[in-house]
Amino acid sequence: MSAGGDFGNPLRKFKLVFLGEQSVAKTSLITRFRYDSFDNTYQAIIGIDFLSKTMYLEDGTIGLRLWDTAGQERLRSLIPRYIRDSAAAVVVYDITNVNSFQQTTKWIDDVRTEGGSDVIITLVGNKTDLADKRQVSIEEGERKAKGLNVTFIETRAKAGYNVKQLFRRVAAALPGMESTQDGSREDMSDIKLEKPQEQTVSEGGCSCYSPMSSSTLPQKPPYSFIDCSVNIGLNLFPSLITFCNSSLLPVSWR
């Protein structure tokens, strides 16, 4: 691991947006990567959720900002603004749901319309643990990815299969990280902060956490942006800036 990535240079930060239909397990993929855990009781996201993770690679250290989006049709109008300024997009489908696979074409088109041609796109077939219910073959996924000029991988968030491999591939393709190979040594450790005290959120307000007071974000998602928008500075000594003004939120979120 490059020492310069830790002390000599500012931490490179990249925005990754996760897209796909409802119930394809986008949140499960992010949670498996971020916490190495799986929860069968996730609720559908209403709007946008945000998590961050620091990856320590052989060629340096990078900060990933992971944006988890809602798949419901009624919330589709919120998504384009979060595609913008993304370095990479992960478009997920459920291998047991052929409609979710067919809809990936539209999601990829949205990425290229809103983010431009430089956004790195990965097509992900998730839930390979349900092989007996498979409706989309590996070959179909590979063929579609090739036709749309994106990368492809199948994953199983429930058991963690190929999840780290997915993020390694994305990291290797990010600007300035092209020399990072899939087989390079990697430490997925996170910046360690003390576990926060449990806090409650009252209606119309928000609960704010600051690493400066030995607290961090709760260890279990989702973190909703409906009540409170959080921007985390991913530096060696992270800081937290919290904006709790509901007037800044879109009308449809209030």
Swiss-Prot record:
Enzyme class, spelled out:
hydrolase
Similarity field = Belongs to the small GTPase superfamily. Rab family.
Q: Which organism is it from?
A: Homo sapiens
Protein name (record): Ras-related protein Rab-6D
* Motif mapping: Switch 1: 32-50
The record lists GTP as bound by: 23-28, 39-40, 42, 71, 126-127, 129, 157-158
Q: Which GO terms describe its cellular component?
A: ciliary basal body; cytosol; endomembrane system; Golgi apparatus; nucleoplasm
UniProt key word GTP-binding: yes
- Listed binding positions for Mg(2+) are T27, D68
